[in-house]
Amino acid sequence: MAYNSYATPQQKPSDEVERLPTEAVNIWSHQRAERIGAFLRIALACVLVATFGGMPVHARVKKIQISVKESPTFGGYSWPGVGQYEKIVGRAFGELDPKDPKNAVIVDLQLAPKNANGKVEYSFDFYLLKPIDLSKGNHKMVYEPPNRGRKTIAALNRGVGAKDPGSVQDEALLANSFLMPQGYSISFSGWDASAGISSADFNMTIALPIARNADGSPITGPAYEYIVNPGASYVLAYPAATLDQSKATLTHRVHLNDIPETVPASGWQYNADGTSIGLLPAGTAFVKNDIYEFSYVAKNPTVNGIGFAAVRDWNAWLRYETKDDSGTPNPLAGDITKIYTEVSSQPGRLLNDFRYLGFNQAENGKQVFDGMMQWIAAGDGISMNYRWSEPGRTERNRQDHLYVEGRFPFANVMSRDPITGKTDSRYAKCELTHTCPYAMEIFTANEYWVKAASLMTTDPTGTKDLPDSPFTRIYFMSSMQHGTGRDTIRGVCQQFQNPLDSQAVQRALFTAMDKWATAGTQPPPSQYPKLADGTLVKPEQNSTGFPQIPGVSYTGFKTTRYLLNYGPNFYKTGIPTVNPPVFTAPYQDNPANGPIYPSFVPKTDKDGNDVAGIRLPEVQVPLATYTGWAVRADPQSPDGCEGSGQYIPFARTKAERIASGDPRLSVEERYGNMETYSSMLRDAINNLVKAGFLLPFDAERALHKNVKNVTSQNLLTQK
């Protein structure tokens, strides 16, 4: 039988920053699309009635194709009590019933091509690591939905996890890893169409269908692109429905609050098939770091919401089924008792919407995930389950404001939206089906400034704090940027990047989550700024208390959450009729852009370090000011520097401080000598261990790292 076109975008670099905890370099924030038409034929087997515990097959992973099986992997390394691991890599093929109420929430699923059984088909890459002898494992699995196709688990796993984790053969690194010594199985799978079509370097991809009108004709509609740093051409997420330039508008500006200038039709062109645009004369590059916006009529929308079901059904299949429809055995059949997710940023936003939309209930009615480590995802959703969506996009205080990301409900507990009158929470659906996962919501100061994270802990009117959900804890990593930067690199920012690293805290909280899900042991109390105690404040400098530091710009600019107008029925149908919505300068708290959800930022101490939250040893016993926000250097100054924070060192001596006019005490004035500094540092680390925010192994490393940092710079005398 014939199938309609399937599509997967082609990777393409962008300057939009999404920093990973183990990387100081940028990863692509969104990869663009080159639609490919293909007849994707998936071998259909007769429907087998496989059973697991008396349950019929529900998780519609129909077939897996294994391309790599390496046993043992990790160079044959064997962990005491667990033994050796094996690696299994391949492609999984799934199908969805559009009539199943659990799938009905997926926008445009009814308009996707269907097979002879009336099902919608898709496929994705998977990568699995497991003990060869499952009886020696702990019968639990960690699942990571990759960040734009890329694995980020190395942060949690003490350095083992990038690209092809099984290729690591460094015995010292493997011995000190976090997950394998405990016997965890680890899985990754494709879900995000913006990850491209190439599986090179074990990039995790997904092939999704293109929606069409009921009569088979192409769907067209208004689409929008935010463009920064594309070079001489820009590949559109969706091809243009017409090459008529009068149906499109390209604008350009240098600063966020500048008035956009329209580029005349004589200044740009489509390529021959309408899949990209470029400036004229041909070969002219877009100005680096300037803002271009393109609105046009697009065609062939991908059904991106299938990515939610792909995550659900892959994990449900591994957990509850014994084999695929062709009889290929499930490598983890009968072994899994718990599944925990681990994410970094973008896929955490995926799982925010995953929970909200009810996807933690499998098609067989059972729970999929038991616990979620939600690292730097805050209360945002993802640009995925609507027509013309782009999952690779991420809104910050300069970029991507007009992609649907920050929508009510923001919190895990019930609150009332004063704009629409709706009462809802991210956990409302799973509470009804008794399938709610425990979750550790861990985010940084950057998420308050560029992601409006305070909406996760306040009501939408911004007048009161919300209580914890019984299923979640919220942990604010004080003074951190979005991930970990390098304190020797400025990039496009005015100051050096913020080097604070939360990997050790994540391991402690993962351990606490496991105990919570397994034994009911309560994790450490939530730690975050609050309105009630004055640690959550307005962004103006006289409210935050941030000091006047010579050479440091303070703008107080934060991202504002609006209820944007995409057309009268958008929030019911997921289909925009107005795109882009009206959005004009100034962009912060401007009622002209729509009703506002008030948001706030953390208060700082006299050094400029955040007061509330989990304060790392470097923040409790500081040698610098660390911020979660940053300002761009010229020519884009004073725009925000997106995911970056700042590292602003203290003067070494009192004389240096006075000479520069710095109000912050010098290192010498604070500590006097190395002995005092080391003692204070040790106390701070021990207190974090007692509070459950550091494991003993990581505590020793933290002490050694910070002492070495001071001695290598000769900041203090010994006594």
For each predicted feature, which ranges?
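N-terminal secretory signal peptides that target proteins for export/translocation
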Residues: 1-37
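Long, compositionally biased, charged low-complexity segments
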Residues: 37-38, 657
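Bacterial N-terminal signal peptides
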Residues: 41-51
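Structural signature of transmembrane alpha-helix termini at the membrane-water interface
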Residues: 50-53, 156
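Sec/Tat signal peptide C-region and signal peptidase I cleavage site
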Residues: 54-59
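C-terminal His-loop and adjacent cap/lid subdomain of alpha/beta-hydrolase
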Residues: 60-719
